[in-house]
Amino acid sequence: MRNLFYILIIFILLGCSVDKNSEVGINPLPNFDAMWDYQHPDSTEIIFIEILEGLKNSAESSYDAEYHAELLTQIARTQGLQSKFIQAHATLDSVKSMLNDNMKTAFMRYLLERGRVFNYSGEWEISKPLFLRAYEFGVENKLDIYTLDAAHMMGIVEPPDKQLDWNLKALKIAEETSDENCKGWLGPLYNNIGWILQGLTEYDQALVYFQKGYEWRTEVGDENGARIAKWTVGRCLRSLKQNEEALKIQKEIQAVIEEKNLPDDGYVFEELAELYLLNGNMELAKKNFTLAYEELSKDRWIVKNQQDRLRRLKKLGDK
C-alpha cells in the first residue's frame, strides 16, 4: 500500500508544476517549473544549471533576484532527489543569503525545499517545523499552490493519526482555490486520502475517495492514472469483501493491459492472485502469485522494504 501511495505522489509531481507563463510566456526568463522531470532529477538538474548559467550572463537590466532564488531552490530539490544532501543544503544556504522580505514566493519555496531535503535524508523530525512554517506563511500570504504543497508534505511527515487532517486541508485548498495550478492535485489527493482511510480500516469512506480519484483521472484523460485509480477501487472492494466485483475490476484492468500491449503490472497480478485464492481457484491463484513475484521482485523499493511480501508471493506461487 505504501508503495502505491508514493507512486501517486509521482503523479502529483508530474501533474502539478506551476505554470507561471507557460514554457516562456510574457517573462523572457524560462519557466523552469514546466521543465521538471521528477523521474529523472539528474537530467533536470543539468537543465536548471544551464538556465542558471544563462541567468548569470544576462544583462543587469533583465536580472530577477527572486527568480534566481526560486531556481536555486529547485536545483536543490534535484540534488536531494539524487541523495546529494550536502550539496543540496549548500545550494539552499546560497538561497538563504539572497532572501529579503519582498521575496515571499522564494522564501516559501526555500522552506519547502529545505524541509524536503531533510525528509529525503531521513531527518523528517527536522523537516516538520519547516513544512509547518511554510504552511502558515502560505496561508498568511495567500500562496495557495505552495500552501497546498506544504499541507501535503505535513501529511507525509506527521504520524498516521494526523495525516488525514493534513491531506483534507490540502484537498480543501485544491477544491476551493481560484488558482488553476492547484487543480492538478485533486486526483492524487483523493488517492492519498483513500489510502489513509484504508489504513484506518474505514473502507466505506476510503472507497468514496478512490472512486473520486478514478472519476477525476478519467475526466482529465489520464489513462495510466485512471488505470491505477481503478485498481485502488478494486483493492478497496476486496477489503469490503465484495470479491466478485473486485475480481471483475482487476480482470478488466488486465484485459486492457493485454489489449494495448502495456508492460506487465505486478500489482494487478498480485490482486488477481489474492482474489482467486479467496474464491478457491488455486490454479489461477498460483499462476498469478508467480507472475506477481516475477514483476514485483524487480521493484527496488519492495525489495528493500517488503521482503516478507515477496517471500509470501514466491511461496504461494511455488505451491
PLM region descriptions:
Residues 36, 70-81, 109-120, 146-160, ...:
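Conserved alpha-helical positions within TPR/SEL1-like repeat arrays
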Residues 52-57, 93-100, 132-139, 169-179, ...:
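Amphipathic alpha-helical segments of tetratricopeptide repeats
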Residues 14-15:
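C-terminal motif of bacterial Sec signal peptides marking the signal peptidase cleavage site
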